[in-house]
Amino acid sequence: LEAARQAMDSAGSRQTVAQGKLTLSVPKAVGRFVIHPLMMAFFHRYPQVDVCLRLEDRPLDFIDDGIDLALRITDTPSPGLHGKPLMPIRHVICATEAYLQQHGTPYTPQDLRAHSCISLGETPADARWKFRREGKTETVPTYGRYAANHTAVRLDAVRQHLGIGSLPLFTAREALANGDIVQVLPEWEFISSYSGDLWLLWAGDKHMPARMRAMIDYLSETVPALNAGSTEPAK
């Protein structure tokens, strides 16, 4: 089957028009907030390409899983894969103006001890928030009545004034721009163990079908542009 697929891809690589089905695996939150909003324009640009978007957070085998391209957040891509970083993944902490008016605005990381903080909640370490500013690092144990391991859920909880939540910037960006939420402690960099670069990965450069090259070029153009003019956390 793999030999047949390679033969088809080899034929596809000689085609100048991008066409056929492409399977793209992405982390769930990245798929929802970054990639899915870009797909409509891709379909207009490449009307003969069909896309299967898989939202999944698990290790991949490109051949066994039938994956053409994958996006993963990492600083160390798997050996043997080809790829390129598209954008850095930063995290911020946010709240609504209404929450801050009722409970006060934190001015230092230690002030968070007096607040309800919405964390990832997968391990105890997720409630120990770490910050950096001008070479100084502070770690604060936080408490909150609610934790959730999905970014969309945490964003919704923040919007409902449940507390101060940790969010990837790509999740919070639209709500920040609309004024639905505000960044807390913007002078401090929030250090998350889930940060890194968003890498676009593929198994090999040989006999690359035109549809794969089209998606690589499209994501290389559109994803980095998402950071242009956005509110980045302090470095």
What residues fall within each predicted segment?
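Alpha-helical "hinge/linker" immediately C-terminal to small N-terminal DNA-binding modules
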Residues: L1-S13
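Central regulatory/effector-binding core of bacterial HTH transcription factors
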Residues: Q19-H82, E232-K235
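C-terminal effector-binding regulatory domain of bacterial HTH transcription factors
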Residues: Q48, R173-E174, N178, E187-K235
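A local structural motif
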Residues: Q48-C52, K136-R145
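Beta->alpha turn/N-cap motifs
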Residues: D57, I73-D75, A95-E97, L167-F170, ...
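Flexible hinge/capping segments at coil-to-helix
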Residues: G80-I118
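Secondary-structure junction motif
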Residues: S116-G135
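Hydrophobic hinge/microswitch elements
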Residues: T139-I191, W202, G229
